[in-house]
Curated annotation (Swiss-Prot):
GO terms for molecular function: protein domain specific binding. The gene is Cntrob. This is Centrobin. Interacts with LYST. It comes from the Eukaryota.
Length: 887
C-alpha cells in the first residue's frame, strides 16, 4: 500500500532513518532521543491510520468509528505532547518542535474530515438497509439467490409449477390444488421482492464502498504529501543534528587534547621522578665507591708499608734480573727485525689484494650500471603498458556510466509499472489489501518495538559511557593530584636526606683530606730526612774515596821512592805500543771517579835487567826473584815497564753481545798483528774489547804489581802465608800455576799464539759485574781495610816468591783483588781466604777456567746500556781493535 512504501520522490527513506537511528553510543544523547521520539510518533500515526482503515471495513453493527478515531487522535496528541515535553528539555530543538506540531495539526484535521465522511455514509446506509452486514467478509461469503431460491432440479420445478406436470407423459396424477398454487405464488412474489430489496442494498453497498475507496485514495495521496513534508523536515532536523554532532566532536576533541596534555604532564613528572631516583642511586653508588676507595687506600697504605719493606729485599733480585732482561732485549730485537720483515711481506700482499679488490669493484660497478640500464628500459615498457591499461579502464568506466544511466531510467520505468500494478491489484483484490495491511501493521509494531529497545539501549549505553568517562576523569584527576602531592613529599624528603648525606660525605671527605695532608707532610719530612741522610752518606763516600786515593798515592810514592834508589839502566830496544786513550767509562751508581794525579813519565828499567843488577849487587841473596820476574815482565810488556804514574782502576761492565765468543776472538787477529809486533798499537778511535779495562789502567796496575814483586822481602818461613790463599767460589775459581823450584833464566820470546779460550780468559775478570759493589759502593770501606788488602797482596806475592811457584798470573791476581773488594763491601766474611793444604789444587782449578769463562761472561752481560754510554761521542767497542796475545 501507499502507507507502507514512501514516495519515490522523497529525499529521505525509512531505511535511511532507521539506519541513522542505530548510531554508535558516542553521538550526542539529545539527537538520539529526538530521533527516537520522531520515529515513534511516525509509527504510531501509521498504526492509527491502519486501524482506522480496518475499522472502515467493519460491519455497521459494530461500534461507531467515532470512538476509534477519537482514541487515535488522543493517542497521537498524547505521543506528540510527550515528545514535545521531552524536546523542550533539550537544547536547540524549538524550531523542529514547532514544525512537528504543525504536522500534527494537519494530521488531526485530515483524520477528522475522513471520520465525518465515514460516519455520515454509515448512518445513511443503516437507515436504508434492512439487513445488517457485519463486514466485507460477510458480504463476500453470503449466497442470496442460491440459499433462498429452490434448486433447479426436476422435483423442485414440479413443486413450483404443478400445473405443467400434466403435460408430461406418464401416469395420471392427483387433481391440482389451486390453493397451494396461490400460496406458492404469494411466496414467490414475496421472495422476489425480498431479492429486489437485497439487490438494491447491495448496489448501495457497492456505491458506499466506491466512495470509501475514493476517500482512502485521497487520504493516501494526502499522506504521501505529508510524508514528503515530514522527510524534508527530518532532513532539516538531521542537518541540525549534524551541526550539533560536529560541535560535540569539537568539544570531545578539545577534551581529548586536554587529556593528552594531562597525560604528558604526568609522564614528564614520572620522568623527573625517575631521573631523581637515578640521581639518588648514582649518589649512593658514588658514596659506596668513595667508601670502597677509602678502604682501598687503607689497604694500599698497608701494602705500601709491606712493599717498602720488600723493596729493600727485591733490589738485589731486580739487579740480577736486569742482566737476563738485557739478553731478552737482544732476542726481542732480533725477533722484532724478523717481525718487521714479515710485516713488509704482509704489506706487499695486502697491496696486491687491494688492487685485486679494486679491479673486482670496477667489474661489479660496470655490471651494476648495465643492470640499471636494463631495469630502466623495462620500467619504460611497464609505463607504456600501464598507460594503455589506464586508457582501457577509462573507456570501461565511461561505458559503465552509460549503463548506470540506462539502469536508472529502467528503474524509473519499473517504478511506474509497479505503481500501476499496485493500483490494479488494489482494485482486484481487497482481501490481499487487508492481509498486507495486517502484515504491515505487525511489521511496524515489531520495528517500533525493536527501535524502541535499540534506542533505549543506546541511550543507556551512552549515558553509562558518559557517566563512566566523567567518573574516570574525576578519578584520574584525583589520582594525579594525590600522586603529585606524594611525589612532592617524597622528593622533599629525599632532597633533605640527600643534603644530609652530602653534608656527612663532605665532612668525611674533609677528614680524609686532612688525614692525607698530614700523611703527605709526614712523608715529605721523611723524604727530606732521607735526602739529608743520603747526602751525608755521599759526603762520607766521597771522603772515603779521597782517603783511599790518598792512601794509594802514598803507596805509589813509597814504591816510586824504592824504585828511584836503584840504578836506572838504559831502556832495551823493544817495540812500544801507545796506549789507547780510554773511552768514556760508565761510573758506579751514576758517578764518575776523578783522579787528580796526572801521569808522570819516568823511565824504568826492564825487569830482567833490574833483577840481574840486584843479583850482582847482593851476592848472597837467593835466586827466587830471578825465577819469577821473566814471566811477569813478559806478561806486563814494555808499555807497562815505561810507565811511572799511578792510575786508579774503574770497573767497566761487559757490553759485548752474548754471541761474542771464541769466533769473535778469532776475528780479532788481523793481518797487521804479525809475529814481529807482539804488542800491536791499538786504534785510538776504539775502546777495544768491552770486557777488558782501558789500557792505561791495566798497564798502571801491571806496573804497580811489578814494582811490588821486585821490592818485596824474600822470606821463606812465613807461617801465615797459607792463610792468604783465596777461597774457591762458585762464580770464579782461583788457579795457581806450579813452577819449578830451580831458578831459571828467562826464555827467549817465542812467536807462538796462546789458545783463544785462554787468551779471552786472561782479563775477563774485569767484566764481571758485582751487584754488591754496585749496591753499596765504597761507602762501607775504610782506609785501614784498604791498607790490609794491599798488605795481603804483598804477602801473597812474597809467598809465591818464597815457595818458588813462579810468577803470579794476572788473572788470579785480579780475581783475588775482586774477592777482597767483595769481602770488604759485603762484610759477611764469605770470601775470607783459607788454608790450601794441597799445592796441586791450583793446577786442577787452572784447567777448569777456560771452560767456565764463557758462561761467566754470558751471565755478566748487563741488560740495558746506561745513558752515559749512549750520550758519549766515542764509538762502541770493536772486536778487531786488539791483536793476539803473545808469550
Amino acid at each position: 500500500m501507499a502507507t507502507a512504501a514512501p514516495s519515490p520522490s522523497s529525499p529521505l527513506r525509512p531505511e535511511d532513518l532507521l539506519s541513522d537511528s542505530s548510531e554508535p553510543p558516542g553521538l550526542n544523547q539529545v539527537s538520539s532521543e529526538v530521533t527516537s521520539q520522531l520515529y515513534t510518533s511516525l509509527h504510531l500515526s501509521r498504526q492509527a491510520e491502519a486501524t482506522a482503515r480496518a475499522q472502515l471495513y467493519l460491519a455497521p453493527t459494530s461500534s461507531p468509528p467515532n470512538e476509534g478515531l477519537d482514541s487515535l487522535a488522543q493517542e497521537l496528541s498524547r505521543s506528540l505532547s510527550v515528545g514535545l515535553e521531552n524536546n523542550l528539555k533539550k537544547k536547540d530543538g524549538s524550531k523542529h518542535i514547532f514544525e512537528m506540531e504543525s504536522v500534527r495539526g494537519q494530521l488531526q484535521t485530515m483524520l477528522h474530515t475522513s471520520r465525518d465522511t465515514a460516519y455520515r455514509t454509515g448512518s445513511e446506509r443503516r437507515e436504508e438497509d434492512s439487513f445488517d452486514s457485519d463486514s466485507t467478509a460477510t458480504l463476500l461469503n453470503t449466497r442470496p439467490l442460491q440459499d433462498l431460491s429452490p434448486s433447479s432440479s426436476a422435483p423442485a420445478l414440479e413443486e413450483l409449477f404443478p400445473r405443467y406436470t400434466s403435460l408430461r407423459p406418464g401416469p395420471p396424477t392427483n387433481p391440482p390444488d389451486f390453493q397451494g398454487l396461490r400460496d406458492a405464488l404469494d411466496a414467490e412474489l414475496t421472495r422476489r421482492k425480498h431479492c429486489e430489496r437485497h439487490i438494491q442494498s447491495l448496489q448501495t453497498r457497492v456505491l458506499e464502498l466506491q466512495q470509501q475507496l475514493a476517500v482512502a485514495v485521497a487520504a493516501d495521496h494526502k499522506k504521501d504529501l505529508m510524508i514528503e513534508q515530514l522527510d524534508k523536515t527530518l532532513a532539516r532536523v538531521v542537518e541540525g543534528w549534524n551541526r550539533h554532532e560536529a560541535e560535540r566532536t569539537e568539544v570531545l576533541r578539545g577534551l581529548q587534547e586536554e587529556r593528552q596534555a594531562a597525560e604528558l604532564t604526568r609522564s614528564k613528572q614520572q620522568e623527573t621522578v625517575t631521573r631523581l631516583e637515578q640521581s639518588l642511586s648514582e649518589a649512593m653508588e658514588a658514596l659506596s665507591r668513595e667508601q670502597e676507595g677509602a678502604r682501598l687506600q687503607q689497604r694500599e697504605k698497608e701494602a705500601l708499608e709491606e712493599e717498602r719493606q720488600a723493596l729493600t729485599l727485591r733490589l738485589e733480585v731486580e739487579q740480577q734480573q736486569c742482566r737476563t732482561l738485557q739478553e731478552e732485549r737482544d732476542e726481542a730485537r732480533a725477533g722484532q727485525l724478523s717481525e718487521h720483515r714479515k710485516l713488509e711481506a704482509l704489506q706487499v700482499a695486502l697491496q696486491e689484494e687491494r688492487q685485486a679488490w679494486i679491479k673486482q669493484e670496477h667489474q661489479l660497478k660496470e655490471r651494476l650500471q648495465a643492470l640499471q640500464e636494463e631495469g630502466q628500459a623495462q620500467l619504460e615498457r611497464e609505463k607504456g603498458n600501464s598507460q594503455r591499461e589506464a586508457q582501457a579502464a577509462w573507456e570501461t568506466q565511461q561505458q559503465f556510466a552509460l549503463l548506470q544511466t540506462e539502469v536508472r531510467r529502467l528503474e524509473g520505468d519499473l517504478d511506474t509499472v509497479r505503481r500501476e500494478r499496485d493500483a490494479l491489484q488494489l482494485e482486484m483484490s481487497l482481501v490481499q489489501a487487508r492481509y498486507e495491511s495486517q502484515r504491515i501493521q505487525m511489521e511496524s509494531e515489531l520495528a517500533v518495538q525493536l527501535e524502541q529497545r535499540v534506542t533505549e539501549r543506546l541511550a543507556e549505553a551512552q549515558e553509562n559511557s558518559l557517566r563512566q568517562a566523567a567518573s574516570l576523569r574525576d578519578h584520574h584527576r584525583k589520582q594525579l593530584q594525590e600522586l603529585s602531592g606524594q611525589h612532592q613529599q617524597e622528593l622533599a624528603a629525599q632532597l633533605a636526606q640527600f643534603k644530609v648525606e652530602m653534608a656527612d660525605r663532605e665532612e668525611r671527605q674533609q677528614q680524609v683530606a686532612q688525614d692525607y695532608e698530614l700523611r703527605l707532610a709526614r712523608e715529605q719530612a721523611r723524604v727530606r730526612d732521607l735526602k739529608s741522610g743520603n747526602q751525608q752518606l755521599e759526603e762520607q763516600r766521597a771522603e772515603l774515596v779521597e782517603r783511599l786515593q790518598a792512601m794509594l798515592q802514598a803507596h805509589w810514592e813509597e814504591a816510586n821512592q824504592l824504585l828511584s834508589t836503584t840504578l836506572l839502566p838504559p831502556n832495551p830496544q823493544a817495540p812500544l805500543a801507545e796506549p789507547s786513550s780510554p773511552g768514556p767509562l760508565e761510573p758506579e751508581k751514576g758517578e764518575r771517579r776523578t783522579w787528580a794525579m796526572p801521569p808522570m813519565a819516568v823511565a824504568l828499567k826492564p825487569v830482567l835487567q833490574q833483577s840481574r843488577e840486584v843479583k850482582g849487587d847482593v851476592p848472597g841473596a837467593p835466586s827466587v826473584l830471578c825465577s819469577t820476574s821473566p814471566d811477569l815482565s813478559l806478561l806486563l810488556g814494555p808499555p807497562f815497564q815505561n810507565q811511572n804514574s799511578f792510575q786508579p782502576l774503574e770497573p767497566k761492565p761487559d757490553v759485548t753481545p752474548p754471541t761474542a765468543g771464541p769466533f769473535s776472538a778469532l776475528e780479532a787477529f788481523t793481518d797487521d798483528h804479525r809475529a814481529e809486533r807482539p804488542f800491536p798499537e791499538e786504534d785510538p778511535g776504539s775502546d777495544g774489547d768491552a770486557r777488558l779495562p782501558p789500557a792505561s789502567q791495566l798497564e798502571g796496575l801491571k806496573n804497580f804489581l811489578q814494582q811490588l814483586l821486585e821490592t818485596a822481602p824474600q822470606s821463606n818461613g812465613n807461617p801465615s802465608a797459607d792463610l792468604l790463599l783465596p777461597k774457591a767460589g762458585s762464580r770464579a775459581v782461583s788457579s795457581w800455576e806450579e813452577a819449578p823450584q830451580v831458578p831459571r833464566l828467562p826464555p827467549p820470546v817465542h812467536k807462538t799464539k796462546v789458545p783463544l779460550a785462554m787468551a779471552s780468559s786472561l782479563f775477563r775478570v774485569h767484566g764481571l759485574p758485582s751487584t754488591n759493589l754496585q749496591g753499596s759502593g765504597l761507602s762501607t770501606g775504610s782506609p785501614e781495610k784498604d791498607g790490609l788488602n794491599l798488605v795481603d797482596v804483598s804477602e801473597l806475592l812474597r809467598l809465591y816468591q818464597a815457595r818458588g811457584w813462579g810468577a803470579l798470573p794476572a788473572e788470579d791476581l785480579l780475581l783475588y783483588l775482586k774477592r777482597l773488594e767483595h769481602s770488604g763491601t759485603d762484610g759477611q766474611g764469605e770470601l775470607v781466604p783459607r788454608r790450601n793444604t794441597d799445592s796441586r789444587l791450583g793446577e786442577t782449578t787452572r784447567k777448569e777456567i777456560p771452560s767456565q769463562a764463557v758462561p761467566r761472561r754470558l751471565a755478566s752481560v748487563p741488560k740495558t746500556e746506561k745513558p752515559a754510554r749512549k750520550k758519549s761521542g766515542h764509538p762502541g767497542p770493536s772486536m778487531r781493535s786488539r791483536g793476539g796475545i803473545w808469550r
